[in-house]
Design a protein with these regions (language model features):
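Membrane-anchoring hydrophobic segments
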Residues: 1-210, 214-219, 256-263, 268-280
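Small-residue-enriched transmembrane helix-hairpin modules in multi-pass membrane proteins
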Residues: 8-22, 38-56, 177-196, 275-364
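Alpha-helical protein-protein interaction elements
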Residues: 27, 83, 87, 225, ...
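Helix-loop-helix junctions and helix-breaking kinks within/between transmembrane helices
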Residues: 102-115, 227-252, 363-364
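Generic detector of ordered, mature protein regions
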Residues: 125, 223, 244-248, 255-256, ...
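Long, hydrophobic/aromatic-enriched structural stretches that serve as scaffold segments
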Residues: 199-248
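Loop-centered beta-sheet repeat module
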Residues: 236-298
């Protein structure tokens, strides 16, 4: 096996050729409509007690919501660099849910002009993510081509050992009804380093191993990815950690089987189709998976951003003092010893640690 990561241009040149203005528009609108439909007909009906609202919007407000949600995709030009994978996933799994949720959750409370202003700022931010892929310097390319996978293995081993060292006394399997107890118990063992490493392990390290296992047909990589996600679940009770290998596998099947679609089109089609299928097939056996995927995974970025925006509309801003290193210099964190995620969790009455995406925690 090649001991270095391959040049991303050699792998994804065909993907760029599959991108077109028409396909971008059609698949993006399909996904935006799907999420709007799920928000109105599932989230607001089943989970309304968790601050999922259905504000009445007129045609112009709905139209502008679609325009803002659609705008950044025209700056996406296919898989050109490794960052392209992350940017399109952020667009589908984070950006669109945030834009749609803000319109339906916050318009009555904050006024549509305030909501639209935040949506426009997010649109430019997402567009910039896509534009970054076009910035390609000789220095950055050499860096990509000369990072041996050996050092990635070393980083993985050190991360795993540190997490096991920190939480080995309380790592265990729990049912979904007990995950908040597990999180509460393990919060006393956590520190800023373990919190960051847990996020990296959940959304980067072990997904990369599982993905490499699929692409290279390496059983060892698949095993590392699966065991890593199981370990994270035993530490944090994160449902996303258990669901991640399943989602990656399904995306892999869709991308490899639908040859005439690009990665972005396949991902939008897959997420939309799975969402509609889970909603329409109303059987009790799917209730858990439906809630995990539609509510806990797909809607959570928008839900949390909406709650952060609502909370900070009438509470003091942290001015980045929620970041431990910053607060060690400024000592200005306004909520005492309570982490910002817990503060928001108390506000939205879930009594959970509402850690959110960077747009919410560092943007709002």
């Amino acid at each position: 096996m090649n001991n270095k990561f391959q040049n991303i241009d050699e792998i994804t040149s065909a993907d760029v050729q599959k991108e077109s203005l028409f396909k971008k528009t059609v698949f993006s609108i399909f996904f935006i409509w799907t999420y709007q439909y799920i928000h109105i007909n599932y989230l607001c009906e089943v989970w309304s007690y968790m601050r999922y609202f259905k504000n009445e919007l007129d045609f112009s407000q709905v139209f502008l919501t679609y325009i803002v949600a659609l705008f950044p995709i025209y700056f996406y030009s296919g898989l050109k660099q490794i960052s392209s994978y992350f940017s399109i996933i952020i667009y589908i799994m984070c950006y669109v849910p945030i834009v749609v949720t803000l319109s339906y959750n916050n318009t009555d409370e904050l006024g549509y002009n305030t909501v639209l202003l935040h949506q426009v700022v997010l649109a430019f931010s997402m567009s910039f993510f896509f534009l970054v892929d076009k910035i390609k310097t000789i220095k950055s390319k050499r860096l990509i081509l000369n990072i041996p996978i050996f050092w990635f293995h070393v980083f993985t081993i050190l991360t795993t050992l540190y997490l096991v060292y920190k939480f080995s006394g309380n790592m265990r399997f729990v049912g979904f009804e007990d995950i908040y107890d597990l999180r509460s118990e393990n919060s006393q063992f956590s520190d800023p380093i373990s919190q960051y490493l847990t996020m990296w392990a959940t959304y980067l390290i072990y997904p990369i191993y599982f993905s490499l296992g699929l692409v290279k047909r390496q059983k060892m990589y698949l095993l590392i990815g699966i065991l890593g996600h199981i370990m994270i679940y035993m530490i944090s009770g994160a449902k996303a950690s258990i669901l991640m290998p399943v989602i990656i596998f399904l995306i892999y099947i869709v991308v490899t089987k639908i040859k005439y679609l690009s990665f972005s089109q396949s991902l939008a089609f897959f997420v939309s189709s799975l969402s509609l299928l889970l909603f329409k097939v109303d059987v009790d056996s799917l209730f858990l998976f439906r809630s995990i995927f539609l509510m806990r995974t797909l809607s959570m970025p928008g839900y949390l951003f909406s709650n952060y925006l609502s909370f900070f509309s009438n509470h003091p801003y942290t001015q980045y003092s929620h970041i431990g290193i910053v607060n060690s210099f400024t000592n200005s964190y306004p909520y005492g010893d309570i982490p910002i995620g817990v503060v928001i969790g108390d506000y939205d009455m879930t009594n959970a640690n509402a850690n959110a995406n960077f747009w919410a925690t560092d943007g709002v």
